[in-house]
Amino acid sequence: MAHKKAGGSSRNGRDSQSKRLGVKKFGGEAVIAGNIIVRQRGTEWHPGTNVGLGKDHTIFALTAGNVNYRTKANGRVYVSVMPKAEAAE
């Protein structure tokens, strides 16, 4: 009677942690300087005015304002921050 008694454990069962990539602030949302707008691998979205590009391609706000997404003729999507108009005092 040949029976297998001690089978090895499966070779699967591993996975990497999710990186939580994607858009964090959508068009029209208010941001302050330093807010992360998009986390990405590579430049799926490109930096426009009043935003910075981190070394990991994170796009973040440089000034307070509202987020704006714009597709240019070259097909690239540019992320900008439109500063809020200061209230006249």
From Swiss-Prot:
Biological process per Gene Ontology, one example term: translation
SUPFAM superfamilies, alphabetized: Ribosomal L27 protein-like (SSF110324)
Annotated keywords: Ribonucleoprotein, Ribosomal protein
Record's GO cellular component terms: cytosolic large ribosomal subunit
Region of interest called Disordered, as start-end residue ranges on this chain: 1-21
Residue ranges that the Swiss-Prot or TrEMBL entry lists as coiled coil: none
Pfam families assigned: Ribosomal_L27 (PF01016)
GO MF terms held by the record: structural constituent of ribosome
HAMAP family per UniProt: Ribosomal_bL27 (MF_00539)
NCBIfam families: L27
Family per similarity comment: Belongs to the bacterial ribosomal protein bL27 family.
UniProt name for this protein: Large ribosomal subunit protein bL27
Species of provenance: Rhizobium rhizogenes (strain K84 / ATCC BAA-868)
